Amino acid sequence: MKKFLGEKQTRFAFRKLAVGLVSAAISSLFFVSIVGVDSVQAQEKLNVHYKYVTDTEITPQEKELIVSGVPRMPEGNEETYYLVYRLNSNAGAKTLPNTGDNNSNTMMAAGLLLTTIGLVVFAVSKRKVQSKFLLTVLVGASVGGGLILSVDALENGSLLQYNAEYQVSAGESLPSPGEISGYTYVGYIKDESIKKLLDNKIPDNQQNANVDKEALNQNKKLDYSVSFDKNGLKNQTVGVNTIEPQDEVLSGRVAKPELLYKETSIETEIAYGEQIQENPDLAEGTVRVKQEGKPGRKIEVVRIFTVDNAEVSREVLSTKIEEATPKIVEKGTKKLEAPSEKPVTSNLVQPEQVAPLPEYTGVQSGAIVEPEQVASLPEYSGTLSGAIVEPEQIEPEIGGVQSGAIVEPEQVTPLPEYTGTQAGAVVSPEQVAPLPEYTGTQSGAIVEPAQVTPLPEYTGVQSGAIVKPAQVTPLPEYTGTQSGAIVEPEQVTPSPEYTGVQAGAIVEPEQVASLPEYTGSQAGAIVEPEQVEPPQEYTGNIEPAAPEAENPTEKAQEPKEQKQEPEKNIELRNVSDVELYSLADGKYKQHVSLDAIPSNQENYFVKVKSSKFKDVFLPISSIVDSTKDGQPVYKITASAEKLKQDVNNKYEDNFTFYLAKKAEREVTNFTSFSNLVQAINNNLNGTYYLAASLNANEVELENGASSYIKGRFTGKLFGSKDGKNYAIYNLKKPLFDTLSAATVENLTLKDVNISGKTDIGALANEANNATRINNVHVDGVLAGERGIGGLVWKADNSKISNSSFKGRIVNSYETKAPYNIGGLVGQLTGINALVDKSKATITISSNADSTNQTVGGLAGLVEKDALISNSYAEGNINNVKRFGSVAGVAGYLWDRDSSEERHAGRLHNVLSDINVMNGNAISGYHYRGMRITDSYSNKDNRVYKVTLEKDEVVTKESLEERGTILDVSQIASKKSEINSLSAPKVETLLTSTNKESDFSKVKDYQASRALAYKNIEKLLPFYNKATIVKYGNLVKEDSTLYEKEILSAVMMKDNEVITDIASHKEAANKLLIHYKDHSSEKLDLTYQSDFSKLAEYRVGDTGLIYTPNQFLQNHSSIVNEVLPDLKAVDYQSEAIRNTLGISSGVSLTELYLEEQFAKTKENLANTLEKLLSADAVIASENQTINGYVVDKIKRNKEALLLGLTYLERWYNFNYGDVNVKDLVMYHMDFFGKGNVSPLDTIIELGKSGFNNLLAKNNVDAYNISLANNNATKDLFSTLANYREVFLPNKTNNQWFKEQTKAYIVEEKSAIDEVRVKQEQAGSKYSIGVYDRITSDTWKYRNMVLPLLTMPERSVFVISTISSLGFGAYDRYRNNEHRAGAELNKFVEDNAQETAKRQRDHYDYWYRILDEQGREKLYRNILVYDAYKFGDDTTVDKATVEAQFDSSNPAMKYFFGPVGNKVVHNKHGAYATGDSVYYMGYRMLDKDGAITYTHEMTHDSDNEIYLGGYGRRSGLGPEFFAKGLLQAPDHPDDATITVNSILKYDKNDASEKSRLQVLDPTKRFQNADDLKNYVHNMFDVIYMLEYLEGMSIVNRLSDVQKVNALRKIENKYVRDADGNDVYATNVIKNITMADAQKLNSFNSLIENDILSAREYKNGDVERNGYHTIKLFSPIYSALSSEKGTPGDLMGRRIAYELLAAKGFKDGMVPYISNQYEDDAKQNGKTISIYGKTRGLVTDDLVLRKVFNGQFNNWTEFKKAMYEERKNKFDSLNKVTFDDTRQPWTSYATKTISTVEELQTLMDEAVLQDANDNWYSWSGYKPEYNSAVHKLKKAVFKAYLDQTKDFRKSIFENQK
């Protein structure tokens, strides 16, 4: 029936009592007449009421009253507006249960009924207007008949919670209607409009009941006063209630009634059932009892709530069922074909045998009951619908399934149905005797005040129960009926649908069709008759009541099977450990044992740790003596609302665990770490055994303590006893300070986390005097500022055997002091010192930068005859600095004290399986006579070391100290051969468990759904297993939830991650599910209710529910208490420095956190609320637990702030619309590890030390401090996995480029096959910047986070096939290119052009190399612009170097955090082997391109350009760059070189003087093109040189020859290895005697002659910057008779070989060590770094290249000239500039024969000889030499004519 908005509605519902708690019920007051009371008008402001309704709740007539728009101004003192909303089409129905009465015709009946039972109900509420109060009193009952009228207009249903009341001043605008999710605002209806409509609709019978309003409105004459005793509230705590509108009226004027409760146990016998078994061996008809039955028991712990000694409700806290033993009867079936029929049993132990209850459709239909899949009941409008009436002849036994349902005692005579005039009203028919007055515990329904928050969906037992008040003295035990209790028995087989009088149990399964609205006067009332005996156990079927004759339509339906829902509880699953804490004297302490039962147990609490879920804090409810495994222990019980524990597959209330009783005194065998420490400190010479695994957390060290046991331990400690191995867990400092002649055996130290400023080791700082350490194993982390050893720092004449260390060692502290770091021992010293049959699995981060700073995989320093044998190391050593003594086995072996080889350290049968940065494989320092035998290393290990070559630092693969190199396939077997050591299995701590959730024993478990249960467990982390199985069975088999494993689920509001659930629980609308394969899906999420402090959500249309891994907890008290302390912390304070572990003199600059630190402090309150919400669960409000959290934060405030600042600084970036910072900081379970504490993790991060928090160490910091807690491998796999989840359709690089503000240019090759490879995202071929800087071979992977978090565009990045360049915009900033758009355009345009040049250069190399060389071009060379930044006033180039503390954004946000401290010098640029650094030159300039080809040659020649053969011994890096493989500086360079990078334009001004290739990308398509070009170029060179030579020998005098010519010789200097085979070219003047020999062209070759024009006297420095002049002949063919040629002759011959045989077959064999093996076979060897190498000689190369064609290089040179001479007759005609004429004349000369050219050459040679300017200091051939000018003109003409020598000049083209 549709109700009208203005109709009065009277609500009586016990459910509302549970919400309000302050209504008053007063009985035995009678009023003669019907009274309606208006509100008292006593206010100074205007009252406005907003009531929210939906358009479905109003009638068509009322819809016509809707006014569009919003209310504007109030017109009266008190007005009501009905705000109408329409439900959006995509929103779900949100209808509250129908519990109200809207039938005005029933009021009289209600009055008569209340008269009969003597019940008066007062509803008291208050409105406060300034200092005055409105008191509305609703009075019910009369003697002869009464009418109850409510004074307020009808509250709506669906949107009730939005109702609001405002006070506004006259003329003030009204508030706007609120926005409601899922609804659209329509308009409003004024209250007066409704009243007018209602005036026309009041029934006659109600009009007759009206009284004189004038009399009733004399408000001042009415004085209603109600008094309550306030004293009754002392020491009582009322449960949590979200709405308490009555409190205001009661405060000070009306006392509150006491709500009390007590707890009691109720025991009910469970009758045993009878089972009939067929026995084929018994004769048919024979019956015998096989087993006698035994009754069971159901024990319920019930909490009874009372007000004024009257019970108002009860709550079943726990139910324990002791199963009944069924009676088993055997029936014989022998010779009978038909088996006997089984009787129906009622055994509760076997609920599947319980016959179904019939569906109930009688009275009480207003209770909250919606059995699953039950068809809607017809609306009931008969007599006393909702009253407690027992139908005739129905005597059901209520128990088991129906236990706790609302029942009626047998003695009450049921009222007959009334069908008269006022059917539905509460009346007493004439023939029916009145019911006796009811005064039981629930007499009096409670009116619901306005604006009550909607009730959540009921999904489990006791929903809606009153929250437990704290410490209430229990009332006397109640043993009466359990009517009204909300009970759902645990895992009981579904009862049949019941249609009798008791339908109305409060159970509402999901997706059930709604019951018809009950409109009777007591709909929803829950009333218990007085003094009703407990109902008997239900043991069988209940027959449905016979329908009334006069109401044949109310026919009982057929029984329908109903499945009983499992009881929903809180269960802590997968418990791994339990920790007990206490508060005493303001300090918190962890207890691993107890001395006695504490008297102040309220100061104790427990932290329950799980292998899968968050820690849970629980208050202690009891500690009692007990035994476990025969040992006396303490049984400790912790409690929380609805918490149960699975004990042997049975649930028990609360959570219990056991704690050891601390032995008062232990002498030899120890089960307490504190006892052990105390005993050893008292007697350092005793013998001690572990009798259990010990927890070092038991001992709290003093500040500054360096170890647990002080002094020199000379006794014995054994970690095993009676065949069991034990461990000591959680050491925070070394166990011993010093071991002296001591013995430690069979001991394991697990989870060590040790830090210290001095030298440290996990077991001891030092072991000396023949100490024996055997079978000792350590795992964990050690961090220090100086020496570190995994076991001991220093072992002096002591033995370590069969021992191991596994973990991380961190020491990146920068100091000049010497130190030693080793995986097992830092320093091993003395002839009796030994490490044998041991191993280390390590990750070492160090900063060693001098030879006295040693780092080794097994030991740092091994000296004084100490020995390491039969041992190996595996893992990684990353030494950031370059010059320390670092190696995979031992860092340093030399004995510094004696400086004698015979006392050096020794290595025997050792193996290095370690990747080493800046070190060697076996030993870090090489010298002759090393005492190393049988050493091995892994070929696949990356071992790099830097060396100084000339003035450049070059990083290259270390070939020193590699030992015997094994293939990776041989490593495992070699390790086993060396030793087969493995760590023993040890006993766990007493409080540790490994109990995993086992769903297989849960009812309805399906093995095929194991993964579904595992996934639901993630979605419901705190619910019991039965609930998980229930929802696991609802997972659809075609859903992803059924097929893939969930790692985590994250709540979101659209794309925003929600962390603080308590503050945003209703805002969440999406659930992001992250699967193990890193796929994800978003499901719709809808908040539906709370269950025991858990917010419960509906997941889309799946039928599933979700609860976050958080309890609803308000942390404001904690936040408010710690906030002042945190905000008082100063970044530059000593407290911060102490936390970082640095002195006051150390700058904090390189942390780059100061700016973020201030921002973090500004938003601390919000951050802390999120952090605490994401952290450990506080299951029950407890001041001791809160204090523990407060204490932890205050004690670690500096570390917490540093950790928060660090994460907010480096992880503030997005994946699309999702910011990852909150995921990293708060959702550390995102990758599946649900038991991580974000608070602890962030504190530990902040405490991890200065070096770990350095910006440049951000990759290691994640891997060390965050990866394990996030269940991830490393930073980059984490970033990639985030991308897979949030941006699955993009590559990592695409995401990266969208996120970074750096300007990125990725220039792919112009070669198709290369470009295709480069487009392979994530491959080694990719030129994606992200792909490259995250590769394992990239040295500066720490660039990723700075690039992702840059706040502005200040850096550019250029990526090409072989290099990755970085530079700052401000490097190009000056007064011509000012900051802003102008500078940006200049930089970005030039960055693109530079990228193309670099691309072209390596396309050139790709085309001329073979397949092996081409593959090596796919690499990653770092290129850096200088740290020289200009401003808008800078002229030309900036010249001042910026330091790391510069405020320049490029330095502040990128270069500084990356931490590459580039050494700046006066060079144009320099290379280090893996990097290129521009200095004077700039990357984006044209000369920067030429510099690129030079420096990249240094980084490419050894492994790539030279075919992988390496540089020829004796040739320095500069030999291969300048004048050989780099591009010429300018297009007019008159040198023999090849332009490989710059494209010139025919229209350029420089075209007339260009002597180099116009466009290398077109000229060189393959190696043959290169050979063709050089060969044709040498046609011109050889021809012109021949002509000049002929002019010299034929035209010049001997004196002129002396001036015009020089000769070249070799000299040899012995090097550091004793070699004197590397030639240095020396240029000398020729003598007259020499000149006299020069009478033919060949004589110039034979006498090693060269031109004096551009070659000056003196030594041609080896490894120098030399070029071969294009127009100054070198006739000589000088070779090195001993070995390697000099720099000048080497370059010239190299190019001549390129012209003759090509790059691969001519040049490469000459300048590389290609023929080294041949040299060895020929007995030509040299020593390099103590190793014998083959010496490649010129003669060997000549013989191999030309296959014996030439006997010497002179013959080769003569042949080359002769080859061209033979073609002179075919010389092409050519026209060139006539250099004899002034250049302004533009005269040209054409020649067709060589003879013509010879004539011109003769003239030029004579002119130069006559001028004789060769020795003039200002002599420049291009201006002062006629020969030079002529040659240049001819060369240029032929260059142009042949289109860059695509054709020969000898083609007889006339």
Swiss-Prot record:
The keyword Nucleotide-binding does not apply. Zn(2+) binds at residues 1494, 1498, 1518. Residues 155-1854 are extracellular. A motif (LPXTG sorting signal) lies at residues 96-100. It is a multi-pass membrane protein; Peptidoglycan-anchor. It is found in: Secreted, Cell wall; Membrane. It comes from the Bacteria. Its main location: secreted. It catalyses: Cleavage of Pro-|-Thr bond in the hinge region of the heavy chain of human IgA. InterPro entries: G5_dom, GLUG, LPXTG_anchor, Peptidase_M26_C_dom, Peptidase_M26_N_dom, YSIRK_signal_dom. One of its GO terms (molecular function) is zinc ion binding. The active site is at 1495. Its EC number is 3.4.24.13. The modification Pentaglycyl murein peptidoglycan amidated threonine is found at residue 99. Residues 552-570 have a biased composition (Basic and acidic residues). Binds 1 zinc ion per subunit. One of its GO terms (biological process) is proteolysis. Sequence repeats lie at residues 349-368, 369-388, 389-406, 407-426, 427-446, 447-466, 467-486, 487-506, 507-526, 527-546. Residues 349-546 are annotated as: 10 X 20 AA approximate tandem repeats. The chain crosses the membrane at residues 106-125, 132-154. Residues 1-37 form the signal peptide. Its cofactor is Zn(2+). Zinc metalloproteinase which cleaves human immunoglobulin A1 (IgA1) in the hinge region. This is Immunoglobulin A1 protease. The lineage of its organism: Bacteria, Bacillati, Bacillota, Bacilli, Lactobacillales.
